[in-house]
Amino acid sequence: MAMLLPHPHPDFLKGLLKAPFRCYRFIFHSSTHLGSGIPCAQPFNLLGLHYAKWMLLSDGLKRNLCVQTTLKDHKEGLSDKGQRFVDKLFTGLIQGQRACLAEAKTLVESTHSRKKELAQVLLQKVLLFQREQEQPNKGNPLAFRLGLSGPPGAGKSTFIEYSGKLLTERGHKLSVLAVGPSSCNSGGSLLGDKTRMTEFSRDMNAYIRPSPTRGNLGGVPRTTNEVILLCEGAGYDIILIETVGVGQSEFAVADTVDILFYYCHQLEEMNCRVSKEVYLRWQHGSNNYVCWRLDCASSKDTGRVCDALKLLRRRLAVWRPKVVRISARSWRGGHWNVGYDARILGPNTCQRGAACQTTKATESLDVEPHSGKRVRAFQESPHSPGADSCSGTKGPPWGPGPRASSRFVVEGF
């Protein structure tokens, strides 16, 4: 999508000199067929800048791509103390130090403007490190993201308590992001999920961190994607995301995870409320499970939900949502064994899902009210290098993280 900036050449050149983090070298030709006598000007790639191609017209400038700064440019704005602080967190994070992971998570969730700059540099370094780790695996994601959603009291924390211990015994490293509700008036939160996991919280191969929603109505906080990136950089291969007790419209976690477990209460019949909840989870998540406790649901209930899911359009040719009855305490139902089915769909499916997760996270992290529309316009543009990011095997190329991508699109597009 091209954008025409109606500025005369002298005024525009003066503006370029004042723009931070952008260096240009203009090449002037002798021909004057464009009317102004200065037919074209091209930027050059200095210090690793991902540059855009420019063409000077008679009274304006045509822009085909956006300018994106790299990690080195962000580092230039940091002080020596801030740079040492970021390097310390990054070194401890990739070494698996839990204290550095907790401090990095606090930094990412901060709303202070200076701390946001430090967090952005840290996230870029973690993402570059993660991409290097994924190269031997042909670019496939190394971590498995699993979401747990459902109404209050459905058994989400019980599932994490018992299945988490089993997975750590098998040699996995788990990171649990337990989301708690926040007060709209005082801003306080009740983060009691970790205290109920008495045995699992003492496991050294598990990292449990409660997080408040901070007024976000999607069931998870807005910084969920950044926190997941930090946990993956720290070496955790399974990420469990427990949402708050949700109703019928909180489905933001489906855009973040690879597979979603939705837990239901006891049902005497398949009513309209559950039909709507199952439909919403199915429409907003590719790999879904609808789970009932064995002591609550009957085979008739599961059969009715299966019949309802058959009427919905399939989003993936290799996957259909499943309905299971499980028991975390007695380990009946094999819920974790069936959960691994989503991992064997193939590397292309995993990469495509990761690309779509990053794309949707970029849309949600808007810096100003209309930035989500700008992101969609950028994605639909034929000049966008990430136009086919959700259909191919590569992730979006415009930024190292959702928040940086959103800011990049707003400022440059």
UniProtKB/Swiss-Prot annotation:
Segments of this protein annotated with the region Disordered: 362-406
**Residues annotated as transit peptide in the record:** 1-65
Q: What is its EC number?
A: 3.6.-.-
Where does this protein hold GTP? G150, P151, P152, G153, A154, G155, K156, S157, T158, S327, A328, R329
An example molecular function term from Gene Ontology annotations: GTP binding
Position of the signal peptide: none
Give the UniProt family note: Belongs to the SIMIBI class G3E GTPase family. ArgK/MeaB subfamily.
Name of the protein this chain belongs to: Methylmalonic aciduria type A homolog, mitochondrial
